[in-house]
């Protein structure tokens, strides 16, 4: 009799609409229960039985129940699942398979089966890519996944690399394809094979894409020619190789090996500016005045060169610092190194006075054995030879930015707008509390930004600098010329790494159009989106592999008294993140390790400080001694403890 009763239906509808609901993200805990986080201030308890319907990270709508002053959430509707495509480790065998996602907060095995047409018999410990097919909030009985790709077996020494590349859906090897002959581009190439060009790189580098030649001019000025490898002389726009490079966007540099953007035959041989081999290049000739200013007579042209020496960073630095036993092979090469060091000094001073110079941070290099084991991690400080190349490249990129802006009005530009205007007042207020007075309007201009950066660099510690970092906007890739506040420059367009950056290949083609006096087509904005996304994925992949290798490297230090100097890089409610100075590893120090009495401890992300009994005990940028308490291999996390 109650079937199709309109009154009953109306009552149900009314009850439904009156029941309080909330949308938020599920946060799991290790104890079975969870929370529905609605915003930074509000969260609701999810009891263990209800947690079985959801997964950590799911965005859901839940019904809110109130019983005896306590509110709890009952998941009702899935807005966006946390897991769609993921990597994990297979459990079980044959017909009864499950997969545990490789994520620190997802511990439960998800029943699964191999997709049709996947010819691999999965067994315990295998790594796989899976896609979620069922979810309890979609009306399914349980979670269920489908294995779509076999990655590798559990004991493979190279798991960190293969799993990370599969996780981010990145290529594992160099692209296929060969370039048989140079294109006829209608360019007249200047023959510079007689000049003493040199390359300066790491000893192991094969893809040399820049060579330098310097000359002293009679009036105290210096001339610099930057010659850059010319892959667009081999790769036609729109060709198969070009399309592959466009998708990859960058060479992916991971600890231990790289996955090139171009076929290795091109990147490491045909285009690489090897010593004593004649190579086509795109070149830029510039004149530097005595104070390091780049004069207006910038000239881009096509040429052929023959590098006369493959020099190595450390050897060149040693020689310039009068240490070590390496000597340039001839007086001509020695003269080049001396002139390039002069150029470096002039340009460094010019940038210090008129733009911005980054603080030198060491690069960390993993030294790996045959089986991917970490033999050592060495900090490689940026020395004079690194700076020679850096100054030459920055100068060349400034030249390209100017020429493309003035002749075409577009190109592939690296743009950084400094501070987000919405944050200007908060920034000024924060600086004021530390005794620095800035105008909220002025700090949004290039000059105002540079002025502030110089004041911050003059501070005794980097603490204040670290506090304002959150107010900065991100660097972007744009087809429109614009300033790069981070470098303190009006415009910056890179063209010096075309073997490893697709944007630089585009700028090569545009510069060639300028050289030939032809009209050029503005690059489409989609390409900048693809490049930004690939750059993000490559950085995440590099970080993920690094985390894995750091965990392997420090595993045997866990629980020992070995001390490490560590810089505090971030403070949150739960504790502090630190970077080990000698090797670059990131470790976490939980709040209870800082002070046993929780009520006497205040960890403030806002202030970048840890206070104990009202006194500041730690702050971001402090360097402290730590020991390694624990290394959790399954999550690749390192837990440290301050030395008392």
From Swiss-Prot:
<comment type="similarity">
    <text>Belongs to the RNR ribonuclease family. RNase II subfamily.</text>
</comment>
<dbReference type="Pfam" id="PF08206">
    <property type="entry name" value="OB_RNB"/>
</dbReference>
<dbReference type="InterPro" id="IPR050180">
    <property type="entry name" value="RNR_Ribonuclease"/>
</dbReference>
<dbReference type="InterPro" id="IPR013223">
    <property type="entry name" value="RNase_B_OB_dom"/>
</dbReference>
<dbReference type="InterPro" id="IPR001900">
    <property type="entry name" value="RNase_II/R"/>
</dbReference>
<dbReference type="InterPro" id="IPR011129">
    <property type="entry name" value="CSD"/>
</dbReference>
<dbReference type="GO" id="GO:0006402">
    <property type="term" value="P:mRNA catabolic process"/>
</dbReference>
<dbReference type="InterPro" id="IPR022966">
    <property type="entry name" value="RNase_II/R_CS"/>
</dbReference>
<dbReference type="GO" id="GO:0003723">
    <property type="term" value="F:RNA binding"/>
</dbReference>
<keyword id="KW-0378">Hydrolase</keyword>
<feature type="domain" description="S1 motif">
    <location>
        <begin position="561"/>
        <end position="643"/>
    </location>
</feature>
<dbReference type="InterPro" id="IPR012340">
    <property type="entry name" value="NA-bd_OB-fold"/>
</dbReference>
<feature type="domain" description="RNB">
    <location>
        <begin position="189"/>
        <end position="516"/>
    </location>
</feature>
<keyword id="KW-0694">RNA-binding</keyword>
<dbReference type="InterPro" id="IPR004476">
    <property type="entry name" value="RNase_II/RNase_R"/>
</dbReference>
<comment type="function">
    <text>Involved in mRNA degradation. Hydrolyzes single-stranded polyribonucleotides processively in the 3' to 5' direction.</text>
</comment>
<dbReference type="InterPro" id="IPR011804">
    <property type="entry name" value="RNase_II"/>
</dbReference>
<keyword id="KW-0540">Nuclease</keyword>
<keyword id="KW-0963">Cytoplasm</keyword>
<dbReference type="GO" id="GO:0008859">
    <property type="term" value="F:exoribonuclease II activity"/>
</dbReference>
<keyword id="KW-0269">Exonuclease</keyword>
<dbReference type="Pfam" id="PF00575">
    <property type="entry name" value="S1"/>
</dbReference>
<protein>
    <recommendedName>
        <fullName>Exoribonuclease 2</fullName>
        <ecNumber>3.1.13.1</ecNumber>
    </recommendedName>
</protein>
<dbReference type="GO" id="GO:0005829">
    <property type="term" value="C:cytosol"/>
</dbReference>
<dbReference type="InterPro" id="IPR003029">
    <property type="entry name" value="S1_domain"/>
</dbReference>
<dbReference type="Pfam" id="PF00773">
    <property type="entry name" value="RNB"/>
</dbReference>
């Amino acid at each position: 009799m109650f079937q199709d009763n309109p009154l009953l239906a109306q009552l149900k509808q009314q009850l439904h609409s009156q029941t309080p609901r909330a949308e938020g993200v599920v946060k799991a805990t290790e104890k079975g229960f969870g929370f529905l986080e609605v915003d930074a201030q509000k969260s609701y308890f999810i009891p263990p039985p209800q947690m079985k319907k959801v997964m950590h990270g799911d965005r859901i709508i839940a019904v809110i129940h109130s019983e005896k002053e306590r509110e709890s959430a009952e998941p009702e509707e899935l807005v966006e699942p946390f897991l769609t495509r993921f990597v994990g480790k297979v459990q079980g065998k044959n017909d009864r398979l499950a997969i545990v996602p490789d994520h620190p907060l997802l511990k439960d095995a998800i029943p699964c089966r191999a997709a049709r047409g996947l010819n691999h018999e999965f067994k315990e410990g295998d790594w796989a890519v899976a896609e979620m097919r069922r979810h309890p909030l979609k009306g399914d009985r349980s979670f269920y996944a489908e294995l779509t790709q076999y990655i590798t077996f559990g004991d493979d020494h190279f798991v960190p690399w293969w799993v990370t590349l599969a996780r981010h859906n990145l290529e594992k090897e160099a692209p296929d394809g060969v370039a048989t002959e140079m294109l006829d581009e209608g360019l007249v190439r200047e023959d510079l094979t007689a000049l003493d060009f040199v390359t300066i790189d790491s000893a192991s580098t094969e893809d040399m894409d820049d060579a330098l030649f310097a000359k002293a001019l009679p009036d105290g000025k210096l001339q610099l020619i930057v010659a850059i490898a010319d892959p667009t002389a081999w790769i036609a726009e729109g060709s198969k190789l070009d399309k592959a490079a466009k998708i990859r966007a960058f060479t992916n540099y991971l600890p231990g090996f790289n996955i090139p953007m171009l076929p290795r035959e091109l990147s490491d041989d045909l285009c690489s500016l090897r010593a004593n081999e004649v190579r086509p290049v795109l070149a830029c000739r510039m004149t530097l005045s005595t104070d390091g200013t780049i004069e207006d007579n910038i000239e881009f042209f096509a040429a052929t060169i023959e590098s006369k020496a493959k020099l190595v960073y450390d050897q060149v630095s040693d020689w310039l610092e009068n240490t070590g036993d390496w000597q340039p092979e001839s007086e001509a090469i020695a003269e080049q190194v001396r002139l390039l060091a002069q150029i470096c000094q002039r340009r460094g001073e010019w940038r210090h006075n008129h733009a911005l110079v980054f603080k030198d941070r060491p690069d960390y290099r993993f030294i790996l054995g045959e089986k991917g084991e970490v033999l050592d991690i060495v900090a490689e400080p940026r020395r004079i030879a690194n700076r020679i190349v850096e100054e030459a490249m920055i100068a060349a990129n400034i030249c390209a930015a100017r020429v493309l802006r003035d002749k075409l009005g577009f190109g592939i530009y690296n743009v950084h707008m400094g501070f987000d205007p919405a944050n200007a007042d908060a920034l000024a207020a924060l600086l004021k509390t530390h005794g620095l007075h800035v105008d909220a309007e002025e700090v949004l201009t290039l000059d105002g930004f540079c002025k502030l950066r110089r004041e911050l660099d003059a501070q005794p510690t980097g603490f204040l600098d670290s506090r304002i970092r959150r107010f900065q906007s991100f660097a972007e890739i744009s087809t429109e010329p614009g300033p790069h506040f981070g470098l303190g420059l009006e415009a910056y367009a890179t063209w010096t790494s075309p073997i490893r950056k697709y944007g630089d290949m585009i700028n090569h083609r545009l510069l060639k159009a300028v050289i030939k006096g032809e009209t050029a087509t503005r690059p489409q904005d989609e390409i900048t989106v693809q490049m930004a996304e690939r750059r993000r994925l490559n950085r995440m992949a590099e970080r993920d592999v690094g985390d894995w290798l750091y965990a392997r490297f420090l595993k045997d230090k866990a629980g020992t008294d070995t001390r490490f100097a560590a810089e505090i890089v971030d403070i949150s409610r739960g504790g502090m993140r630190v970077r080990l100075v000698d090797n670059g590893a990131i470790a976490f120090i939980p709040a209870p390790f800082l002070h046993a009495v929780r009520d006497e401890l205040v960890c403030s992300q806002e202030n970048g400080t840890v206070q104990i009994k009202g006194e500041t005990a730690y702050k971001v940028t402090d360097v402290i001694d730590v020991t390694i308490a624990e290394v959790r291999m399954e999550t690749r996390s390192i837990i440290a403890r301050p030395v008392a």
